[in-house]
A protein has these predicted regions:
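ATPase nucleotide-binding head domains, primarily ABC-like/P-loop NTPase cores
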Residues: 1, 167-199, 244-511, 517, ...
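Alpha-helical coupling/stalk and coiled-coil linker elements that connect catalytic or binding modules
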Residues: 1-309, 313-345, 367
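Amphipathic alpha-helical segments within well-ordered protein domains
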Residues: 15, 41-42, 221, 387, ...
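Hydrophobic residues in alpha-helical segments
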Residues: 18, 44-45, 325, 372-375, ...
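Dynamic helix-loop-helix/coil hinge segments at AAA+ ATPase domain boundaries and subdomain interfaces
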Residues: 226, 522-525
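Short, amphipathic C-terminal "tail helix"
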Residues: 50-53, 525-545
């Protein structure tokens, strides 16, 4: 967000949730039972939803009533607005509950998911599919009463299906509508039109039930889809509330503070911490750091210090705290004042783009180019070791030019955190207005290097690269040799690589021979005239000479 009023409104909601623990925990519990309604209504509208998707939507909607009841604890601010704006969608949930069973199957092609009592014909087909025992019992009772045959009973066999069996003692009471099918020792078996129709219904009930249930399901899908705008709006409000509860929970659990947000262009952080690094540290406490960046003074910070000292972590934490403040979140600091930025640009780390044919340095320069073209004076720039992918002088020149461009208010003048190992750049503090030197403090005890992780004013005097290499486990022989070479270089560049002219000449000869061989491979002697062959020989001889 870049509108201060919108940020403050969100911060106010987060603060209200941090202060009301009971309501916050109840809301989190209710929200945990709500599925992604936006995705569900999307599947329903596209016709790809199954029965379980409808059940998930129904269960989610029914939780909204709980959420609204819990929001009544907040009588002002954005949370009160959410209570007023949130649609309970009870009619949609009731429609799904009336139509479908509690736990419908995912596939709706096999039937068996319409709730009993919703449709009389579906209920009848379900009765038939269960063996028609109830229907057969009704027919048997009715026929006994109509004919007066007390021993009448209905049975089934595979030869002619359902039948009515009458004992010989009641044969005279058999009505003319009965059709005799089988004679037994003790009685007769008959069929009726009603039994034949019932048998036919039983044979076709499965297909008819599937078709009818799918027809009802399609109608339900269309009716729910018609309410998709309401459902999507409710889903958006639920997502906003879920975000606010999450931000409040994180703020309480990690001792975050509410930042002050304005349009001053000032970033002032007291005891800021990296929100991720402080959580993953197991055996040590995170060392907090202060930050001050203004629109005129301390606009650009040059940060020097050894590798592993914490330069990148510090710059990242400033960017993250700024970003967190502008999404309406509390921040990991004792206090923070954030002047709204329009964009945050970072150039940290790089690797080869093998598929694109770009080297590490080319990738780095491409990213820097995009930053310089897109950044504005209201942007925050995080630039880590620009120019390290090429030679020392080239890299230093590029780094200085980039820093001058970023810091100069006549060109860009954006707030910039610039980490570098080029200590020569620290002289810009006295040349460019708004540039300030900082370094990560360390302590050296004998050969041991202790990182204090604290950022302090002033540039570092050296990079301690060899000490860091030793910490990384380089062999002692290599470390000792590196120290010798470093001393020679520091004494005026006495250590120099000797030119290797012979190697260069061999390289040139090899290039000439390669060109000759390539020309011979391309030649087609069968199609060449004597003059053309002679001309080719002269050309090859000239290449070799």
């Amino acid at each position: 967000l870049r509108d201060v009023a919108a940020i403050e409104r969100r911060l106010g909601a987060v603060e209200a949730l941090t202060k009301n623990t009971v309501a916050r925990e109840e809301l989190i519990l209710s929200l945990s039972g709500i599925s992604d309604m936006e995705r569900l209504i999307g599947r329903i509208a596209y016709g790809t939803a199954g029965g379980r998707d409808f059940a998930s939507l129904r269960n989610s909607i029914e939780r909204i009533t709980e959420v609204k009841a819990q929001l009544t604890a907040f009588t002002t601010g954005r949370l009160h607005e959410l209570d007023n704006e949130l649609d309970t969608l009870t009619d949609v949930a009731q429609s799904i509950r009336d139509t479908l069973i509690d736990e419908p199957p995912f596939s709706v092609r096999e039937g068996g998911f319409i709730r009993k009592g919703y449709n009389a014909e579906v209920d009848r087909l379900h009765e038939i599919l269960s063996g028609g025992k109830g229907l057969l019992a009704d027919i048997e009772t009715r026929e006994k009463e109509k004919t007066g045959i007390r021993t009448l009973k209905i049975g089934y066999n595979k030869v002619f299906g359902y039948y009515i069996e009458v004992s010989n003692s009641f044969k005279d009471l058999v009505p003319d509508t009965y059709i005799r099918k089988q004679t037994l020792v003790n009685g007769e078996r008959y069929i009726t039109e009603e039994l034949k129709n019932l048998e036919q219904e039983i044979l076709t009930a499965g297909d008819r039930d599937k078709a009818l249930e799918f027809e009802i399901f399609t109608a339900l899908r269309e009716s729910v889809t018609a309410e998709s705008v309401r459902i999507q709006r409710a889903a958006g409000l639920i997502a906003e509330l879920d975000t606010l509860c999450s931000l409040a929970s994180v703020a309480v659990n990690n001792n975050y503070c509410r930042p002050s947000v304005d349009d001053s262009g000032v970033i002032e952080i007291h005891d800021g911490r990296h929100p991720v690094v402080e959580r993953v540290l197991k055996d040590a406490l995170f060392v907090p750091n202060d930050t001050y960046m203004g629109e005129r003074e301390d606009r650009a910070a040059i940060i020097t210090g050894p590798n592993m000292a914490g330069k990148s972590t510090y710059m990242r934490q400033v960017a993250l705290i700024t970003l967190m403040a502008q999404i309406g979140s509390f921040v990991p600091a004792k206090s923070a004042r954030i002047g709204v930025v329009d964009r945050i640009f970072t150039r940290i780390g790089a690797s080869d783009d093998l598929a694109g044919g770009q080297s590490t340095f080319m990738v780095e320069m491409t990213e820097v180019s995009e930053i310089l073209h897109q950044a504005t004076p209201r942007s925050l720039l995080i630039l880590d070791e620009i120019g390290r992918g090429t030679s020392t002088f080239d890299g230093m020149s590029i780094a200085r030019a980039v820093l001058e461009f970023c810091a100069d208010p006549k060109r860009l003048g954006a707030k910039t955190l610039f980490a570098t190992h080029y200590h020569e750049l620290t002289e810009l503090e006295g040349i460019l207005p708004g540039v300030k030197n900082y370094s990560i403090s360390i302590k050296k005890r004998g050969d041991e290097l202790i990182f204090l992780r604290k950022i302090v004013p002033g540039g570092a005097d050296r990079s301690y690269g060899i000490e860091v290499a030793k910490l990384a486990g380089l062999p002692n022989e290599v470390v000792k040799r590196a120290n010798v070479i470093l001393k020679e270089l520091e004494q005026g560049g006495a250590y120099q690589a000797k030119p290797r002219e012979e190697t260069e000449q061999v390289s040139l000869d090899a290039i000439g021979e390669a060109e000759v061989l390539a020309a011979i491979r391309r030649a087609q002697p069968d199609t060449m005239s004597p003059i053309e062959a002679m001309q080719l020989l002269y050309e090859l001889k000239q290449k070799l000479s």
